[in-house]
Design a protein with these regions (language model features):
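Helix-rich, typically C-terminal accessory recognition domains appended to large enzymatic cores
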Residues: 123, 335, 343-381, 391-500, ...
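Intrinsic disorder at enzyme termini
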Residues: 473-549
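Structured secondary-structure scaffolds
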Residues: 1-48, 103-107, 151, 158-369, ...
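N-terminal catalytic cores of NTP/NDP-binding nucleotidyl/phosphoryl-transfer enzymes
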Residues: 2-71, 97-112, 117, 134, ...
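Phosphate-backbone binding interfaces of nucleic-acid-interacting proteins
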Residues: 531-654
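Secondary-structure transition/capping motifs at alpha-helix termini
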Residues: 1-2, 36-43, 64-67, 88, ...
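Cys/His-rich short segments
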Residues: 118-171, 175
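A broadly conserved sequence feature marking short terminus-proximal activation segments
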Residues: 71-130
């Protein structure tokens, strides 16, 4: 019988920098869904890739002294790049697309021309607000505090000749799709899209640019490159063979069952994407699912904020499957989740070491201890076995109901309720007591077999989340391929009675939280520091100062006669200065973290003298010493402005 098909995609990621744990979260979740459908017997196509064109890539490449192609090649295919990350995380994608692939570029040109030929793309001029990092145009009303509503960065005015897509033409059809079907999930995203974009009125979309060249040329007007979101969105079709000869399974897998995307790009996938598909008369994807963000310290994790978490570090420290499990066990898939290293360690210790690992270790250890690694054939059932068997055999249906809704966390909750029940069953049946009585060994074998069957079924359902670990568990309990099937995940008694059992090493040793946190935090801080710009300067002041006003400021050379720390202050130094007037001047300055007092005695500095006195720690400060400040690798640096000692006290700067 021919298998049912299932097509699922991640967004294709923008390789302007290394990917972080937020990208990993999305890809691991999509991988788990793909593995779940394969377990059920579906013929799965799982696509991921990279979105490699656009102004931001062009700018970053120029800053790095590289061509755009070389720049993206390094991030995608280089050491510890995108492909290496997905290999490390055991991602089972069937296909990987790069939007710089020749077949994709040629197909996008054909698709763009189709929309032009049918009148849905026309030439005009664009004037509006543009966010370079997001490659997005915005109207004034869509800005939040004058900034990009997606990323919060500055926008700039952009005006250029451009091609436009008649998005407004499809507003009613898109609204119907959103409001009257289950196309967009979770349902909360529908209200966002309708209220924020549809109701205010969809404007036609700018779909070409002339201000940069790193993109797919419009073949009939080469001065234009195709807008990055047209280029990006059609990857889901070109990767199956639409308008190209590279692949030939578009008819087999399209439409997609699920596009899994972060909530910040739901607008493109739920409004623009279906409208463009309608334009070229292609079926719409069945579902778009907008998952939440991993937030850290209350804000979105992003490369620009410097608060990203490196998945390589976590996977190498805790193991790939532990990280995969944490991401899917801890955060509800449709909502934001607060990421912390403490939560990661707690989840590993509680769920993996104490619950799953302990169940497997205790059970296999007792089979080895009491029966040499293989149970005898006889069985002796007891009333207390019934509840465990009933709970275990009902697990698959409860798990399936949650997984089919993409509620991955809830699916794992169902499994761990059974694991908790199995650990309680051990306490109820006290197999260590049965082991002391030779006449109770058949009952002991029954208890241990019941535990092994529980482990088998739980492991089958955990496989999409922790594939490598589940292979190890199956090997420990002697479960062959038949024992691991979806069909047998609700059938009791499948594990052979005489299966070879081997305890082996513990699956998840407990993590020393204090020691590991100290090591991890130090490593992550070093990474963040290394990723910061070498030098950061304070923003330049745009407001001009009247020259006559500037001349009123009295800058003078001053000799430092004495310098001492101010009591009860960690920051303040008290300077006694010769300003040339014949009277000592006292100025306080908060630079103690940069200088010791004795370093500065006898030096010549610059001060502005005609500021009104200001009390600091009860001491009047009459003026201000001039310093230069900047940041190096995120650390603030300060240099007191010292000048040649031959300059006399009181000399005016001009």
């Amino acid at each position: 019988m021919e298998k049912k098909t299932f097509y699922i995609t991640t967004p294709i990621y923008y390789p302007s920098d290394k990917l972080h744990i937020g990208h990993t979260y999305c890809t691991v979740a999509t991988d788990a869904i793909a593995r779940y459908k394969r377990l059920q017997g579906y013929d799965v196509m799982f696509l991921t890739g990279t979105d490699e064109h656009g102004q931001k890539i062009e700018t970053k490449a120029e800053e790095a002294g590289m061509t755009p192609q070389a720049f993206v090649d390094r991030i995608v295919d280089g050491e510890r790049g995108v492909r290496d990350l997905w290999k490390l995380m055991n991602i089972s994608n069937d296909r990987f697309i790069r939007t710089t692939d020749d077949y994709h570029c040629a197909a996008v040109q054909k698709i763009f021309r189709k929309m032009y030929d049918n009148g849905d793309i026309y030439k005009g001029a664009y004037k509006g607000k543009y966010c370079t990092p997001c490659e997005s145009f915005w109207t004034e009303s869509q800005l939040v505090d004058g900034k990009c509503p997606d990323c919060g960065r500055e926008v700039h005015d952009a005006e250029e000749e451009a091609y436009f897509f008649r998005l407004s033409k499809y507003a009613d059809k898109v609204r119907h799709l959103l409001e009257d079907t289950d196309f967009l999930q979770p349902r909360s995203r529908v209200n966002e899209m309708v209220n924020n974009f549809i109701k205010p009125g969809l404007e036609d979309l700018c779909v070409s640019r002339t201000s940069f060249t790193w993109g797919i040329p419009v073949d009939f007007d080469p001065g234009h490159v195709v807008y990055v979101w047209v280029d990006e969105l059609f990857n889901y079709c070109t990767a199956l063979g639409l308008d190209n000869d590279r692949y030939h399974d578009f008819d087999k897998f399209w439409p997609a069952d699920y596009h899994i995307v972060g909530k910040e790009i739901v607008r493109f996938h739920s409004i623009i994407w279906p409208a463009m598909l309608m334009s070229v008369d292609l079926p719409l994807p069945k579902h778009v699912y907008g998952h939440g963000w991993l937030v850290i310290d209350g804000g979105k994790m992003s490369k620009s904020k410097g608060n990203v978490v490196d998945p390589y570090v976590l996977a190498e420290m805790f193991g790939v499957d532990a990280l995969r499990f944490f991401l899917l066990r801890t955060f509800p898939f449709g909502s934001d989740g607060n990421f912390s290293n403490e939560l990661l360690i707690s989840t590993i210790n509680t769920d993996l070491a104490n619950k799953l690992g302990n169940l497997v270790s205790r059970t296999t250890g007792m089979v080895e201890k009491y029966f040499g690694g293989a149970l005898p054939a006889g069985r002796e059932d007891a009333p207390e076995d019934c509840d465990l068997k009933k709970t275990v055999c009902a697990l698959r249906d409860r798990y399936e109901a949650e997984m089919d809704k993409l509620q991955l966390q809830n699916g794992l909750d169902e499994i761990f309720r059974v694991i908790d029940r199995a650990n309680k069953y051990i306490d109820e049946t006290t197999p260590w007591t049965l082991g002391k009585d030779e006449s109770r060994h058949i009952r002991l074998a029954t208890v241990l077999y019941n535990l092994l069957e529980t482990i088998r079924i739980c492991t089958t359902l955990l496989t999409p989340v922790m594939p490598a670990t589940c292979e190890k568990i199956f090997a420990k309990i002697g479960a062959d391929e038949t024992c691991r099937s979806w069909a047998n995940a609700n059938v009791w008694g499948v594990l052979p009675a005489d299966a070879a059992i081997a305890k082996g090493e513990n699956l998840f040793p407990r993590v020393d939280a204090e020691e590991t946190l100290e090591k991890l935090n130090a490593l992550q801080e070093a990474q963040r520091k290394a990723a910061r710009p070498a030098v950061e300067l304070e923003p330049y002041v745009a407001e001009e100062v009247d020259f006559d006003t500037f001349l009123k400021s009295d800058f003078r050379a001053v000799k430092i006669k004495n310098c001492e720390a101010v009591k009860k202050s960690d920051k303040l130094l008290k300077f006694t200065l010769d300003d040339g007037s014949g009277t000592d001047r006292i100025i306080l300055s908060g630079i103690h973290q940069y200088y010791e007092p004795e370093q500065l005695i006898g030096k010549t500095a610059i001060a502005i003298l005609n500021l009104p006195p200001r009390k600091m720690m009860g001491i009047p400060s009459c003026g201000m010493l001039i310093s230069a400040v900047h940041k190096e690798k995120g650390e603030e640096k300060l240099h007191l402005m010292l000048i040649d000692d031959s300059v006399p006290a009181g000399a005016k700067l001009c």
